[in-house]
Amino acid sequence: MELPFAESYKIKMVEPLRKSTREEREQWIKEADYNLFQLKSDQVYIDCLTDSGTGAMSDRQWAAMMMGDESYAGSASFFQLKETITKITGFDYVIPTHQGRAAENVLFSHLVKAGAIVPGNSHFDTTKGHIESRKAFAIDCTVDEAKDTQLEVPFKGNVDPKKLEKVLAEQAELVPFIIVTVTNNTAGGQPVSMQNLREVRAIADKYGKRVIFDSARFVENAFFIYEREEGYADKTIKEICAEMFSYADGMTMSSKKDGLVNMGGFIATRHEDWYEGAKRFCIPFEGFLTYGGMNGRDMAALAVGLDENTELETIETRIRQVQYLAAKLDEYGIPYQRPVGGHAIFVDADRVLDQIPKEEFPAQTLAIELYIEAGVRGCEIGYILADRDPVTRENRFGGLDLLRLCIARRVYTNNHMDVIAAALKNVYDRRHEITRGVKIVWETELMRHFTVKLERL
């Protein structure tokens, strides 16, 4: 018989988890103003809030940390990292930063001016925040297929070429660059096809524009190209990554995802003028150019992590666990953004809690119910995260309202996936008893989901 799939690693160190009572969780979430970001980690049993910086490093990464060069200038660890990034992406100019949003801050400080228009595919929260905080506008050009969570198409993260062309045809002079998020987190961790990257490149060239990849999960995107797109089944993940980046002019990276580290990020580009411009903001915001807010040991671990994760065995293990959880939800009839993405399950809260109006934030309500049910912490990717329109100050209800359940890399077993699925089933089975949601009692102007205060209705 054919041998079943198994993880590409064995476990060397473990961390205990603490269970809690329903009564404790009801009190804790109330004290947190019904914002799961405000919970303490020891109040959480299985943490699916994010996959950013929450993964486990390998023994080789830990070994590399012992060799980290902590020199302020000219760190050997930086040059090791730079060599690895250039080998994978083809980008010669590299600036390290302490995380992905810092990379955006440094690069966008150089490129984004008031009144600018930045088209792309579902800009994530920090990306949109850095654009809108500069009095510029993020224009979503994602394909319409992404709006139908039950539609099975392989690349729902794609940029719609017609939408992109329309923006450029009408307002090209206001566009500093095009941004493509791989994978498309806000749309459900959905991948972008290689063909679509070529199309975006061709449109950019037509109008003389450059392309940036928001690359936090670029390896997951490469895996889906390997698995779903014709002509790539015989390619290595590194070969697919190299072709992907050949269609970009630069990238921002949160290394806390596909870099397999707990902290770090970087900017990389093929253009010296972008590098020279970003340098001016790296030094005052992040630090000197050969550390940029990162320790030498963290740069050393990141270099190893990037190399490890761009091997098929590593990334396949990661994706298969997310697919395992998706199969359990299929068994229970729970709707999520299909097909399942690379780093998380995105439960369609509008379908689960269809009796709760959008003004009462169904996805946040579902996240609260799941936490109370089993101590599983998820994250709303929906109407609260969307923030208010920067001009009208009205809530933006036009997109999807999803409960994201991120799976940390190399951390949980499939038994934990079974717990998550069973807890969701319990909530799903009593969904008709959940008739009211939450209201906002305090919020910030940008990226409100991190600190918003809510009340149950």
Regions found by a protein language model. Give the residues of each.
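Conserved PLP-enzyme active-site core in the AAT-like
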Residues: 2-34, 38-55, 61, 70-94, ...
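Flexible glycine/proline-rich, aromatic-decorated loop/lid segments
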Residues: 137-140, 269, 274-277, 297, ...
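Short glycine/threonine-rich loop-to-helix capping motif typified by GTGT followed
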Residues: 192, 346-361, 390-396, 449-455
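Phosphate/diphosphate-binding loops
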Residues: 256-258, 362-369, 373-374
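Short, conserved charged micro-motifs
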Residues: 276, 354-362, 410-419
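Flexible, glycine/charged-enriched surface loops at secondary-structure junctions
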Residues: 289-296, 316-318, 333-340, 381, ...
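PLP-dependent enzyme catalytic core of the Aspartate aminotransferase-like
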Residues: 309, 373, 385-457
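Conserved glycine-rich beta-strand-loop-beta hairpin in the small C-terminal domain of fold type I
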Residues: 322-323, 337-349
